[in-house]
Amino acid sequence: MSDELTSRVRADFERARFKAFLNRVRSVISRRPTTLLSYDEVKEKLRIGGPIYRGVQTIRVDEIVGSLNRYHQFDRAFLPTQNETSNRWQSVDRAFYEDVNLPPILLYKVGQVYFVVDGHHRVSVAREQGQEFIEAEVRECSTRVNITPDLKMEDLEILGNKVDFLERTALDDIRPDAHIRLTIPDGFDRMLEHIAVHRYFMGLDLKRDISDREAVDHWYETVYLPIVKVIRKSKILKEFPGKTEADLYLWVLDHQHYLAEKEGRPLQPPDKAARQFIKKKDE
């Protein structure tokens, strides 16, 4: 039985390595990286806090998407990418077949995803064996942005910009219901410019100094929301797969400024500018 089990766990590892090879080939063809997320890189970009101990929990294996320090040894599906992990991987796989109870793994939670601190091979074997859940000691790290299991490394730059935007505007505190998502790399920088310009003209209109919070709240209520409401009502977003309401908000204002500069048209109220953009799109 021992020889049979040894052969089985060796075959399991070789199969997992071959799957990792196929994933790598697909990633080259599709130009979509399959690497695990690096906790340190996420921490640096998103300036996350913590960690705070949350106890032992049962965690979905597919919500574990990154690693503290072994993100080069496994791919995004937690398949082993190096033969050096063979002995440890097969040892954990053997424990699976022998129904040995292993200690909980250690995870950092950030948003809706988890990063492995200790227990990479146990996660890898669990996924390969079709296990949906795993016991883990969880420590949660605070973040101002929501992170989901579909997060990619290339998304970090925009999310980092969003963190900077929220730290400078406190929009998530002023408007807890505001959930601005962007796919445009410089989108949040442009929104900061919009708020600064809005604050300037508010000061001229009201003949007084405008606080940061007042400017942010007024911009959101009188500029951003009116455009987004028109976008939602028109259902035009479905014509732009992969784009967001905030992306279209930027396009509406780009179109507005284009008409003003190239055709000399006067600037329109936000909601009218949005309807004008949609009408142009339908022509």
Residue locations for each model-derived region?
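Short, charged/polar connector segments at secondary-structure boundaries
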Residues: 1-117, 128, 177-189, 207-282
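Glycine-rich loops and low-complexity Gly/Arg-rich segments
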Residues: 89-90, 130-132, 140-143, 159-164, ...
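A short, basic-hydrophobic beta/loop patch
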Residues: 99-114, 121-152
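Charged, amphipathic alpha-helical linkers/stalks
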Residues: 147-196, 203
